[in-house]
Amino acid sequence: MATSAIQQSAFAGQTALKSQNELVRKIGSFGGGRATMRRTVKSAPQSIWYGEDRPKYLGPFSEQTPSYLTGEFPGDYGWDTAGLSADPETFARNRELEVIHCRWAMLGALGCVFPEILSKNGVTFGEAVWFKAGSQIFSEGGLDYLGNPNLIHAQSILAIWAAQVVLMGFVEGYRVGGGPLGEGLDKIYPGGAFDPLGLADDPEAFAELKVKEIKNGRLAMFSMFGFFVQAIVTGKGPIENLYDHVADPVANNAWAFATNFVPGK
């Protein structure tokens, strides 16, 4: 809920602005020359992941790709059967949404498995399973970060929600507002204060990192979907499900659960 509120508030009022990515295609600059934009293909001309000869979604068996999918952006495998990328402004918005959701999913997937791993290795948690952890805030003792009351001690769901919306909404609004952008970058890859390690300094390496980010992010989104299904079907976290599968692969696998699953039981 809080994440949806952040995303909605961050994009509110942006419809009056032209998509920065579309401006990259048309004029190559944004904000009256304040920040010069950089085309992805030009930033890494030797990369195999961009341009006409990039890998396609079905390899050599791929049909003719749509004319608007030119391999300019990372993660473009030439697949758009629904025509979602046909309109440049819609494509620019969906591209931004995908990258942001990829980043949330990668953080979320890590947050789902890491507490369970620590718990299995002797670290004390009030509740290590990701979909059960939040309910600890309603317990008498509240929710302690990492099980330590000397760290963050939460007892109000409203306070947690407000803090998340205010703090994360501020950061996301700062990013969407475009300032200050790193040189040659845009609001999806703002650089500057958002790139303290200087990963965007080398254009070719940066172009490769964009591809790695989108590929890992898409896997993370599927992983999160799998974690949700596991929680509904087995009532266990991903690490515990993995342990069960390794212990008895025949009895604990997707097919066995799918054929025996009864909703509500």
From Swiss-Prot:
Details of cofactor binding: Binds at least 14 chlorophylls (8 Chl-a and 6 Chl-b) and carotenoids such as lutein and neoxanthin.
Residues where chlorophyll a 5 binds: 212, 230
Binding, chlorophyll a 1: 79, 85, 98, 218
Residues given in the record as chlorophyll a 6 binding sites: 245, 254
Residue positions where Phosphothreonine is found in the record: 40
InterPro entries named among the record's database cross-references: Chloro_AB-bd_pln, Chloroa_b-bind
Binding site residues for chlorophyll b 3: 156, 172
Residue ranges crossing the lipid bilayer per the database entry: 99-119, 151-171, 219-239
Pfam families found in the cross-reference section: Chloroa_b-bind (PF00504)
Keyword Ribonucleoprotein: no
UniProt family annotation: Belongs to the light-harvesting chlorophyll a/b-binding (LHC) protein family.
Protein name (database record): Chlorophyll a-b binding protein 37, chloroplastic
Source organism of this protein record: Petunia sp. (Petunia)
